Amino acid sequence: MTYNYSKLLGRMREKNITQEILAKKIGLQPPTLSQKLNNKAKFKQAEISNICDVLDIDAKEIGGYFFAH
């Protein structure tokens, strides 16, 4: 199953956070984050939680950012 991360990418732009910066803040290598954003690998629950903390995403909005088709 593939997910559409355009809303997540938009939030990153709003916060002026690049993929490289986000990867470092959540403890991933930039290529690993890129693979996840391109549906080549899946996000782990802890990674989703950490991304929400960094980007100030409310728990009620997680579905729209991580599980949209």
Segments and roles (model prediction):
Residues D56-H69:
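Short C-terminal boundary/hinge segments that cap the last helix of small helical domains
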Residues M12, A23, C52:
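The alpha-helix within a helix-turn-helix
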Residues K40-N50:
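Short, basic-rich loop-to-helix N-cap that marks the start of a DNA-contacting helix
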Residues N16-Q35:
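Short alpha-helical DNA-recognition segment
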Residues M1-I17:
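A short, Lys/Arg-rich alpha-helix, primarily the initiator
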Residues L9, E20, S49:
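Residues within the helices of the helix-turn-helix
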Residues L37, E47, F66:
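DNA major-groove recognition helix of helix-turn-helix
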Residues G10, Q35, G64:
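DNA-binding alpha-helical recognition surfaces that contact promoter or target DNA
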